[in-house]
Design a protein with these regions (language model features):
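Short loop/turn segments that connect beta-strands within beta-propeller blades
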Residues: 18-23, 72-76, 112-117, 153-157, ...
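Anionic-ligand binding region
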Residues: 69, 90-93, 100-112, 116-121
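Short, conserved, GDST-rich strand-edge loop motifs in beta-rich repeat architectures
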Residues: 49-65
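Glycine/small-residue-rich loop that forms an oxyanion/phosphate-binding "nest" at active or ligand-binding sites
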Residues: 1-30, 37, 53, 57-58
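Beta-rich, blade/repeat-based domains predominating
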Residues: 1-5, 31-54, 83-98, 106, ...
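Flexible "stalk/tail and boundary" regions
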Residues: 1-5, 13, 68-78, 94-97, ...
Length: 197
């Protein structure tokens, strides 16, 4: 949610809704996108969306080569970065001027600069990363399907498990007021809540 608008990634379109009434607003079509995944808002009003570069195959997801991170400004999307080197970008987080990317394919956490250059890349845990949130102390929480866990750490520093045994932990959320981590268990259609301060 940014500026009273709810943004929702839907395969190749970012749908927008009035955050109060939920009335549909304009759609932002992203030509060539195959698996729009996470959406994050920057403090400057820019909206970022990841394309994990996947499609449903016969038995599992298959790569499409459309791996990208887009920025949406004034209802138009343009790529910040577009390359299979992005490693199937999934979770996004904007902290000030820093754009963090958690990848499902390469299991990396990295930042993208304004020109789309990948920096500070680090492999985390057992990979298959999904959601990412920022805590008040500046540390990050990142969910990992590969490790069935949520990891905590600071950029350029080691990460450690803070929640384990959560199969398919998807795009996590954090309630700063109550110190609660919300972990959707994608394959089980449920959300678990953990205290993390």
């Amino acid at each position: 949610i940014a500026g009273g608008v709810l943004y929702v990634a839907d395969i190749s379109v970012v749908r927008t809704f009035d955050a109060k009434t939920l009335a549909p607003k304009a759609d932002v079509v992203i030509p060539g996108a195959t698996f729009l995944n996470d959406v994050a808002a920057g403090p400057d009003g820019k909206i970022y969306v990841s394309d994990s570069g996947l499609k449903q195959g016969e038995k599992d997801f298959e790569p499409t080569g459309t791996d990208a991170v887009y920025v949406i400004e004034k209802g138009k999307a343009k790529p910040v970065a577009k390359s299979t080197e992005l490693g199937k970008p999934n979770g996004l987080l904007v902290d000030g001027k820093t754009l963090y990317v958690a990848t499902f394919g390469s299991g990396e956490l990295y930042t993208l600069d304004a020109k789309g250059k990948k920096t500070d890349a680090a492999k985390l845990g057992k990979g298959a990363l999904d959601g990412i949130v920022l805590l008040g102390d500046g540390s990050l929480l990142v969910s990992s399907w590969g490790g069935s866990e949520v990891l905590r750490g600071k950029a350029k520093a080691p990460f450690a498990s803070v929640v384990t045994g959560v199969k398919a932990p998807a795009d996590i959320g954090y309630d700063k007021k109550r110190g609660r981590l919300l972990v959707p268990r994608f394959l089980e259609d449920k959300v678990e809540v953990f205290e993390v301060k």
